[in-house]
């Protein structure tokens, strides 16, 4: 049976036109929702009810970057609702006035940052430093994208020298980012802490990969084992990432396919890959706030290759506690100069006393899982604790109960309703899949919360679906730039 991606509506031109049409026909519904929110919003208990300062401390200016993404928007809303400080925001924009976060009630001012030009990060770095200086920022909370993490680390060091000791940043320096973000460097670092890691090999050529796979095949025959690997780009490579769950080596009668597959990945010294042992088990991700080497807030949840549904694991579960302890060990090892957002991806093997967790990736930046803290007032205090470490709480903050699952309705409408229905109409789907996905969609709408929408702050939701994404789809059509998938929460389009 053909997969949905091979059907006509998944081709470049039809899918962009269909998504533009979806945005257009849903506009009246969204407009009614916004109208209702504007009327109700000012009286909503979730509005910007500032917490008054009782200690007489001066009002501080807090800059949050990355507010086009759900994670940045979530943090500005927390700070706006539960502190009385001056919250401003900054982000890059494909076109002027298209950033969803620009229109949030949670910020007092928005600055447009220059995008990196042809791989040159200097314009971005200069524009961000200019905002930090001109606004006399006291606290910068960085919500980097994958591409901007190292650059934000460079900015942090420069800003500390320029603005002095009173300036604080929730952002690791570039050395820490490189050590944690680069998959091969991460493996070496975690191993040096005495923690277990999957077998990994840094590869800079196809023959190098083939030699390792050949040796593995021989070992598998001799020991009757079935060790397999996955091949992942160390840097950012959307095309390779879409194929990275391909298990290697292939069967013996598929050796030609293995060679063909490897040659398609453009492995080279300038584009290295990591060949990582495939561990059978469920995947989980974490998000934590670290200040001066101490984990202040932590949450974990089930994960996937592109996570669009978030549900927190129970705080007292063995798995959650193991991942927290792992994160604390890394943070404590880095010491007092280590402040930022720290997120890990794990594979869990076994259960109970036999449970093993294998770190497979680290994101030294904010994770979208921070949305699970949306109702947690103490999270705002955790950020402010960087100004007064003696007043900070000793216990790790977890999401406030009752916890909710989070979804993005734009993603679910397409993946749970439209794609199964169109596949059925094309004779390539099953009616059972349509009904099953429709039930899941209804459960999300009635029991979960949308990651972007806030009744007291509805405009980012409107702009996301009726300005930002339509602009991206039009840009894709005009430039003929194809994409394989999109992440609504991070506003990222993956090239194909």
Segment roles from a protein language model:
Residues 253-310, 315-323, 347-359:
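Phosphate-binding site of ATP-dependent enzymes
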Residues 26, 50, 381-496:
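Peripheral (often C-terminal) accessory segments that flank ATP-dependent C-N-forming ligase machineries
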Residues 288, 332-372:
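Conserved metal-phosphate-binding beta-hairpin within the catalytic cores
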Residues 274, 337-343, 396-401:
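Flexible, glycine/charged-enriched surface loops at secondary-structure junctions
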Residues 1-171, 210:
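ATP-binding N-terminal substructure of ATP-dependent carboxylate-amine bond-forming enzymes
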Residues 190-191, 198-200, 214-244, 267-281, ...:
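ATP-grasp fold ATP-binding core
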Residues 239, 304-315, 363-377:
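Glycine-rich phosphate/pyrophosphate-binding beta-alpha loops
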Residues 164-167, 174-199, 203-205, 211-217:
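Glycine-/Pro-rich loop/turn segments that contact NAD(P) or position catalytic residues
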């Amino acid at each position: 049976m053909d997969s949905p991606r091979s059907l006509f509506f998944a081709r470049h031109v039809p899918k962009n036109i269909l998504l533009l049409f979806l945005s257009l026909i849903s506009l009246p519904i969204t407009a009614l929702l916004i109208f209702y929110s504007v009327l109700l919003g000012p009286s909503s208990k979730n509005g910007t009810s500032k917490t008054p300062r009782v200690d007489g401390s001066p009002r501080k200016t807090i800059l949050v970057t990355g507010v086009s993404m759900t994670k940045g928007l979530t943090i500005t809303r927390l700070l706006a609702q539960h502190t009385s400080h001056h919250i401003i925001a900054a982000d890059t924009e494909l076109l002027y006035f298209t950033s969803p976060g620009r229109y949030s009630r949670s910020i007092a001012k928005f600055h447009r940052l220059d995008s990196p030009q042809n791989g040159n990060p200097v314009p971005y770095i200069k524009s961000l430093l200019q905002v930090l200086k001109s606004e006399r920022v006291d606290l910068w909370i960085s919500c980097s994208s994958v591409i901007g993490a190292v650059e934000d680390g460079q900015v942090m060091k420069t800003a500390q020298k320029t603005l002095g000791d009173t300036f604080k940043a929730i952002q690791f320096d570039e050395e820490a980012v490189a050590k944690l973000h680069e998959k091969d460097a991460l493996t070496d670092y975690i191993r040096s802490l005495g923690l277990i890691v999957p077998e990994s090999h840094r590869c800079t050529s196809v023959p190098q990969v083939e030699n390792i796979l050949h040796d593995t095949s021989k070992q598998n025959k001799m020991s009757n084992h079935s060790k397999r690997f996955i091949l992942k780009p160390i840097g950012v490579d959307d095309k390779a990432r879409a194929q990275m769950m391909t298990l290697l080596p292939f069967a013996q009668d598929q050796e030609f396919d293995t060679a063909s597959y490897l040659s398609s990945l453009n492995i080279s010294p300038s584009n290295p890959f990591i060949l990582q042992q495939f561990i059978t088990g469920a995947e989980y991700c974490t998000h934590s706030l670290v200040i001066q080497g101490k984990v202040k807030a932590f949450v974990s949840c089930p994960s996937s290759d592109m996570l669009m549904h978030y549900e927190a694991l129970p705080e007292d579960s063995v798995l959650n506690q193991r991942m927290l302890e792992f994160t604390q060990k890394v943070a404590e090892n880095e010491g007092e100069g280590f402040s930022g957002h720290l997120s890990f991806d794990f594979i869990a093997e076994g259960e109970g006393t036999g449970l093993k967790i294998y770190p497979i990736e680290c994101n030294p930046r904010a994770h979208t899982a921070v949305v699970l803290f949306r109702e947690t007032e103490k999270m705002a205090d955790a950020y402010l604790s960087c100004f007064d470490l003696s007043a900070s709480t000793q216990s790790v903050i977890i999401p406030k109960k009752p916890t909710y699952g989070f979804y993005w309705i734009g993603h679910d409408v397409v993946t749970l309703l439209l794609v199964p229905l169109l596949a059925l109409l094309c004779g390539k789907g099953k009616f059972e899949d349509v009904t099953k996905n429709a039930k899941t969609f209804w459960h999300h709408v009635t029991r979960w919360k949308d990651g972007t929408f806030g009744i007291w702050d509805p405009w980012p939701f409107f702009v996301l679906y009726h300005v930002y994404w339509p602009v991206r789809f039009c840009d894709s059509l005009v430039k003929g730039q194809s994409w394989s998938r999109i992440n609504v929460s991070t506003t990222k389009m993956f090239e194909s």
